[in-house]
Design a protein with these regions (language model features):
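Conserved alpha/beta-hydrolase "acid-adjacent" motif
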Residues: 92-98
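Hydrophobic/aromatic beta-strand patches that form the interior of the parallel beta-sheet core
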Residues: 6-8, 84-86, 111
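Conserved hydrolase catalytic core segment
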Residues: 1-16
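Conserved alpha/beta-hydrolase catalytic His-Asp/Glu region
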Residues: 15-78
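Short beta-strand/loop motif that positions the catalytic acidic residue
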Residues: 79, 85-87, 91
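Short, structured coil segments at secondary-structure junctions
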Residues: 1, 79, 105-106
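Hydrophobic "lid"/C-terminal helical patch
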Residues: 63, 102, 128, 132, ...
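Catalytic histidine-centered segment of alpha/beta-hydrolase-like enzymes
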Residues: 93, 113-129
Length: 136
């Protein structure tokens, strides 16, 4: 059984913007550029390599899955495990209103990493690891 739930640069519900979905319908490259533009705070060389260039529209599948995923927040609320949310202070992809709604319903602790965007695991992996170690 899980002992801790940690959401990193994520929240439920995750709603993907129509503009990003439109890019993903055309191809992975345009969606990747959008995510990097709005999600990345620190400039990282090679970041584009983290995204598929294939013609399989795998990003569209993933983004559609975010919008279509459903669960009952009361199930999470009653799970009786500690829940932590780790966000980047410069993340423009996570909906802060959704974070507020989630934390109003589900007992949880929110942590914010300074000067980090949506990709904390790339932008500041040492700080993210330190924070996760502190939580668990």
């Amino acid at each position: 059984a899980a002992k801790e739930l940690i959401l990193v640069n994520s929240i439920y519900p995750t709603r993907v913007a129509d503009a990003l979905l439109a890019k993903a319908k055309v191809g992975n490259g345009g969606a990747a550029n959008f995510i990097i533009k709005y999600g990345l705070y620190r400039r990282l060389l090679g970041m584009r390599n983290a995204f598929s260039e294939a013609d399989d529209l795998v990003m569209l599948d993933d983004l559609d899955a975010c919008n279509n995923y459903e669960l009952d927040l009361n199930d999470i609320k009653n799970a009786e495990i500690p829940i932590s949310i780790i966000l980047g202070s410069k993340d423009r992809l996570v909906d802060l209103k959704a974070v507020e709604n989630f934390t109003d319903i589900v007992p949880s602790q929110t942590y914010t990493m300074d000067e980090v965007g949506h990709f904390s695991f790339f932008e500041d992996p040492v700080e993210l690891s330190r924070l996760i170690s502190k939580i668990v």
